[in-house]
Amino acid sequence: MKFNDVYNKHHKIIHHLLKKYNISYNYDEYYQLLLIKMWQLSQIYKPSSKQSLSSFLFTRLNYYLIDLFRQQNQLKDVILCENNSPTLTEQPTYFNEHDLRLQDIFKLLNHRERLWLKLYLEGYKQFEIAEIMSLSLSTIKLIKMSVKRKCQHNFN
């Protein structure tokens, strides 16, 4: 299959992923990287495999984008020095940008929302979080929506 055909059929996957992760800054750069990766993936895709081309591209591009985020976070370590320090020879404290944003998010949330977010980031499923917090699944979903709303309102 020619790449033009693949592109015409599946370019919306790239837009969907960029929207899913709220990419607005450097949108074009991420789009270009994902487009190059789509071309590479179209070259190695085997039509005889059980997975459809669209799900193959979506899965691989999603993980590739996550890898790009991880690489970027490793490069964006910030050195924070105390304001009172007369010299920079003291031991600096390292934080990465992700940790700093997470601290900002936690300041916005109430106790139940912070606990939900902590458990969610640790990889627990919604029903597991409901059991741990002794709440109904519908309450957990409301907490999730509240956290999402607060994050979007304050960080977009």
UniProtKB/Swiss-Prot annotation:
Residues 126-145 bind DNA. The gene is sigS. InterPro entries: RNA_pol_sigma-70_dom, RNA_pol_sigma70_r2, RNA_pol_sigma_r2, Sig_transdc_resp-reg_C-effctor, WH-like_DNA-bd_sf. Sigma factors are initiation factors that promote the attachment of RNA polymerase to specific initiation sites and are then released. Sigma-S contributes to the protection against external stress, thus playing a role in cellular fitness and survival. Transmembrane segments: none annotated. Belongs to the sigma-70 factor family. This is RNA polymerase sigma factor SigS. GO terms for biological process: DNA-templated transcription initiation. One of its GO terms (molecular function) is sigma factor activity. A motif (Polymerase core binding) lies at residues 29-44. Keywords: DNA-binding, Sigma factor, Transcription, Transcription regulation. Disulfide bonds: none annotated. The keyword Manganese does not apply. It comes from the Bacteria. The keyword Calcium does not apply.
